[in-house]
Amino acid sequence: MKTKEIVDDMTMKRAITRITYEIIERNKNLDNIVLAGIKTRGVFIAKRIQERLKQLEGIDVPLGELDTKPFRDDMKVEDDTTNMTANVNDRDVILVDDVLYTGRTIRAAIDNIVSLGRPARVSLAVLVDRGHRELPIRADYVGKNIPTSRSEEIIVHMAEIDGQDAVLLVEGA
């Protein structure tokens, strides 16, 4: 299998900063936002967006962690490790994930969010959109569009868990 780094740490930082600016531009009331990071790497991306929002706008946006496994249609897991202390009722919830592929993880995340309350709006921010949707889901905020074939895989490395920031393309996975 051939592996190629397609996003380095500086490019990832810029992509997350761009997503943050787009969130600021498209949301009139930043006080109504709740970030919901999808475990595992989506949580780290959401924390970085949260930090940038604080730096740029001086606002402390609530952040929760979503576990999508209990809501997936392709696996049966009982343990739900969701940690969402913020009230999502009538709030603008922004789901945050590392890679958007088939859309099945996002569908599970939406199911999880609506099990917690009734948000005013749910939008989606992803670091990488690689295409190949199986469900009618699209990201509102995208760091990088990286078209792939189905035989390729996108792997996101985050410094918090992997020791470095990078996005890798693995051919023939």
From Swiss-Prot:
It is an enzyme of class 2 (transferase). It catalyses: UMP + diphosphate = 5-phospho-alpha-D-ribose 1-diphosphate + uracil. Transmembrane segments: none annotated. Disulfide bonds: none annotated. The keyword rRNA processing does not apply. It comes from the Bacteria. Its EC number is 2.4.2.9. GO terms for biological process: DNA-templated transcription termination. SUPFAM superfamilies: PRTase-like. One of its GO terms (molecular function) is RNA binding. HAMAP family: PyrR. Belongs to the purine/pyrimidine phosphoribosyltransferase family. PyrR subfamily. Homodimer and homohexamer; in equilibrium. Regulates transcriptional attenuation of the pyrimidine nucleotide (pyr) operon by binding in a uridine-dependent manner to specific sites on pyr mRNA. This disrupts an antiterminator hairpin in the RNA and favors formation of a downstream transcription terminator, leading to a reduced expression of downstream genes. This is Bifunctional protein PyrR.
